[in-house]
Swiss-Prot record:
Keywords: 4Fe-4S, Iron, Iron-sulfur, Metal-binding, S-adenosyl-L-methionine. This is UPF0313 protein BT_0254. GO terms for molecular function: 4 iron, 4 sulfur cluster binding; iron ion binding; methyltransferase activity; nucleic acid binding. The lineage of its organism: Bacteria, Pseudomonadati, Bacteroidota, Bacteroidia, Bacteroidales. Its cofactor is [4Fe-4S] cluster. It comes from the Bacteria. HAMAP family: UPF0313. It comes from Bacteroides thetaiotaomicron (strain ATCC 29148 / DSM 2079 / JCM 5827 / CCUG 10774 / NCTC 10582 / VPI-5482 / E50).
C-alpha cells in the first residue's frame, strides 16, 4: 500500500498552499463535488492537467454559499482564472427524483449529505465570484454547464432557459471533455500576460475567446459578424414563442455535436449572441493516456477521513478503458458530452492503472469494472475513417449497425486476459452496460463474428458477478425506435444465449434488464404490453425508472415541445403525475397492492384482453 503526504493532493486550504511554498495561485477551481483525487472526478482531472502544464492550482470543494462567503475569499485572487465545476452530475438530477422530490442522499458528498451543494452551482458560484472579484475571468465546465450552453428546456423550472452563460455571468464555457480546451486556454492566457507577476482580467480574455475550440461565450449582437458557414439557430425569444422552433434547433445542435468537423453555432438572446465554437477532433490515444497517467492518489482528500463518499465507493476498484459512445440513445447525454467517436486507452496505460488500484487500502483482488460509457466499444471505429469524417448520424448502430463499423471484440478480449493474468487479480467484473446488439450483429467478416462469439462467452463465464446488467429499456418497437434502441426481439435472443451458456457452464447467473416508463412516444397500452411480455419471460422487474427530461437530449426536446426534432411530427408524452404513475405501475404487476389499480386501468384503456395474460380469467 502506498503512503501519501498531504502535499500529494492538490491544495484545498491556505495552509496547504503554504505547505507547497507558494505565495500565489494561477488557477482556483470550485467544485460541487467532494475532492476525490481520481480520474473519474472532473475537477481532479482538470486540476492535474493544469498542474502538468506547470501551473499552481488549488481546489475548493463544496464551498459554503450561505455564510459570509469565506470559502470564496480564503485563497484570494488567482493570476489566470477561477474555474467552476458543478460536479460529475447535473445538480438538479443529483438533487431531485423524476417526480421532483428531493433526494435523501448526494453520492458525491461525504456521508451522502444532501445539503452541501446549491441548485445550479454553475450559476451560484459564478455569481458570487463575479461579485467578489468582478475583473477576474470565470470559466465554466462540467456536464451541467456543457449541456446548458444554448437555450434548453429545464424540467425543474418547467420552461426554456437561456444559455447558462446569461444567468451565471461567467466569461467562458468549456463544453464536453475539457482537457484540450483548458490547456489551450491557459497557454493563450499566459501569452497575454505583460509580465511574470501580472494577473489576467476578464476584459483581456475577450481577445482570445473566439479562438479556442470547444468553448462558448457571449458577445453583444452589435459586435458580432456571422460567417457564411455558421449555423444560426432560432433566437431564444423565438423558441419561447414557438415550441417547434426549439425542437428544430436541437437537430442542428446534435448533428454538429456528432460531426468529426463541425460548424460554429450561434444563437441570439437578449440583444446578445451566444457563440459556440466547434469542438476539437477526438483525442488521440496518447492524449487520453496522458490524462489518466497523471499522479492521482486515487483517494479522497484526507480532510474527509472517517467519512464515506458513496460515488467513490462505487468506482474505487474500477478502471475506465475508453471514452465516447456511438449508441446515440435518445434519452442519454453521454454522446452530447463525450462524443460518439470512441477514444481508447493503450493497454500499457490500462495495466498501469490496474496496478495502481491494487495498491489501494481494502483491495481484495476484485475489480468492479473494466469499461466505459458502454462495456463493449473498446477500440471500435470506422473501417474507413474518411467515411466517418463526413457522417452526422447520431448513432452508429441504430436503426442498423453501420456497415463501416469495425465491431471486432479482439482488442477488448486482449485487455480482459491481460488484466486477469496480473498476479493478485482474482477476478475482473464488468459493471458497465453491455450492448447486446453489438454482440448479435453478424458482420461480413468471419473473424469479427468469431471474436464476438468468444467475447460473449468470456463475458458471461468469467466477468459477471452473479448479475449482468443490460438495457432493453422497452418492449414496444415503436417506442424503441424513438429511443434509438434495438428491437426487443434482440434482447430475447440474447437472453436465450445467456441462459444456454449458463446451463453449459453450470452457472446460476441472472440477467438484469433496465426499463424506462413515460418516455416520449410511450402510452399506457405500451406499458401494459411490457408487463405481459416481461411476465412471460419470468422477470420481476427491479431496475426501472421514470423518464427524466435532462438538458440536451432528443427525448427531452420531444417531451417538452411535443414534436420530434428530426421529423417535427407530433409525439405524445405522459406529463401529469397521474399519467406517469399509470405507466409506472405496470412494472410492478406482480405486487398484490398494484393489482386493483392495474385492472381498473386495463379496463379504462379497453385492453381487457391483457387481464387474462397477467392475472388469469377469474379477474375479468
Amino acid at each position: 500500500m502506498k503512503e501519501y503526504r498531504l502535499t500529494d493532493w492538490l491544495p484545498t486550504t491556505k495552509k496547504e498552499v503554504e505547505l507547497r511554498g507558494w505565495d500565489e495561485l494561477d488557477v482556483i477551481l470550485f467544485s460541487g463535488d467532494a475532492y476525490v483525487d481520481h480520474p473519474s472526478f472532473g475537477a481532479a482531472v482538470i486540476g492535474r492537467i493544469l498542474e502538468a502544464e506547470g501551473l499552481k492550482v488549488a481546489i475548493i470543494p463544496q464551498p459554503n454559499w450561505r455564510d459570509d462567503l469565506r470559502d470564496f475569499r480564503k485563497l484570494g485572487r488567482p493570476r489566470l482564472f477561477f474555474g467552476i465545476s458543478a460536479g460529475s452530475m447535473d445538480s438538479m438530477v443529483n438533487k431531485y427524483t423524476a417526480n421532483k422530490r428531493l433526494r435523501s442522499e448526494d453520492a458525491y458528498t461525504p456521508d451522502g449529505r444532501p445539503d452541501m451543494r446549491p441548485e445550479y452551482p454553475s450559476i451560484v458560484y459564478s455569481q458570487i465570484l463575479k461579485r467578489l472579484y468582478p475583473d477576474v475571468p470565470v470559466i465554466l465546465g462540467s456536464i451541467e454547464a456543457s449541456l446548458r450552453r444554448l437555450s434548453h428546456y429545464d424540467y425543474w423550472q418547467d420552461k426554456v432557459q437561456k444559455s447558462i452563460l446569461c444567468d451565471s455571468g461567467a466569461d467562458l464555457l468549456i463544453y464536453g471533455m475539457g482537457e484540450k480546451p483548458i490547456v489551450e486556454l491557459t497557454r493563450k492566457m499566459k501569452e497575454l500576460l505583460p509580465a511574470e507577476d501580472a494577473s489576467l482580467t476578464a476584459g483581456e480574455l475577450k481577445k482570445i475567446a473566439g479562438t479556442i475550440p470547444q468553448t462558448a461565450y457571449l458577445c453583444r449582437a452589435t459586435e458580432w459578424t456571422p460567417a457564411a458557414d455558421d449555423i444560426q439557430l432560432y433566437s431564444h425569444e423565438e423558441c419561447l414563442a414557438d415550441k417547434k422552433k426549439q425542437a428544430s434547433n436541437f437537430r442542428h445542435i446534435e448533428e454538429e455535436s456528432n460531426k468529426y468537423a463541425a460548424s460554429r453555432i450561434t444563437q441570439e438572446v437578449d440583444n446578445k449572441v451566444v457563440v459556440v465554437n466547434p469542438p476539437y477532433p477526438p483525442m488521440s490515444q496518447e492524449e487520453l493516456d496522458h490524462s489518466y497517467d497523471l499522479p492521482y492518489t486515487r483517494l479522497p482528500h484526507p480532510k474527509y477521513k472517517g467519512k464515506r463518499i458513496p460515488a467513490y465507493d462505487m468506482i474505487k476498484f474500477s478502471v475506465n478503458i475508453h471514452r465516447g459512445c456511438f449508441g446515440g440513445c435518445a434519452f442519454c447525454t453521454i454522446s452530447a458530452h463525450q462524443g460518439k467517436f470512441i477514444v481508447s486507452r493503450s493497454k500499457k496505460s490500462i495495466l498501469n492503472e490496474v496496478k495502481e488500484v491494487m495498491q489501494l487500502p481494502d483491495f481484495k483482488g476484485y475489480l468492479s469494472d473494466l469499461g466505459g460509457p458502454s462495456a463493449n466499444m473498446y477500440q471500435m471505429k470506422g473501417k474507413d475513417e474518411a467515411i466517418c469524417k463526413k457522417c452526422k448520424r447520431p448513432s452508429c448502430i441504430h436503426p442498423k449497425v453501420c456497415p463501416n463499423l469495425n465491431s471486432d471484440h479482439c482488442p477488448l478480449l486482449d485487455i480482459y486476459k491481460a488484466v486477469d493474468a496480473i498476479p493478485g487479480i482474482k477476478k475482473s467484473f464488468i459493471g458497465s452496460g453491455v450492448r447486446y446488439d453489438l454482440l448479435l450483429h453478424q458482420s461480413k467478416d468471419a473473424a469479427t463474428n468469431r471474436s464476438t462469439a468468444e467475447y460473449t462467452r468470456e463475458l458471461i463465464v468469467n466477468h459477471v458477478s452473479g448479475r449482468l446488467k443490460v438495457a432493453p429499456e422497452h418492449t414496444s418497437d415503436r417506442v424503441l425506435s424513438i429511443m434509438r434502441k434495438p428491437s426487443f426481439e434482440q434482447f430475447e435472443t440474447f437472453k436465450k444465449i445467456f441462459d444456454r451458456i449458463n446451463r453449459e457452464e453450470n452457472l446460476r447467473q441472472q440477467l438484469i434488464p433496465y426499463f424506462i416508463s413515460s418516455h416520449p412516444g410511450c402510452k399506457e397500452e405500451d406499458m401494459a404490453e411490457l408487463a405481459v411480455i416481461t411476465k412471460r419471460l419470468d422477470f420481476h422487474l427491479e431496475q426501472v425508472q421514470d423518464f427524466t427530461p435532462t438538458p440536451m437530449t432528443v427525448a427531452t426536446e420531444a417531451w417538452y415541445s411535443g414534436f420530434h426534432p428530426y421529423t417535427l411530427e407530433p409525439v405524445f408524452s405522459a406529463k401529469t403525475q397521474r399519467e406517469k404513475l399509470a405507466q409506472r405501475q405496470f412494472f410492478f404487476w406482480y405486487k398484490p397492492e398494484e393489482r386493483k389499480n392495474i385492472l381498473n386501468e386495463l379496463r379504462r384503456i379497453g385492453r381487457q384482453d391483457l387481464i387474462d395474460k397477467l392475472y388469469g380469467k377469474r379477474n375479468k
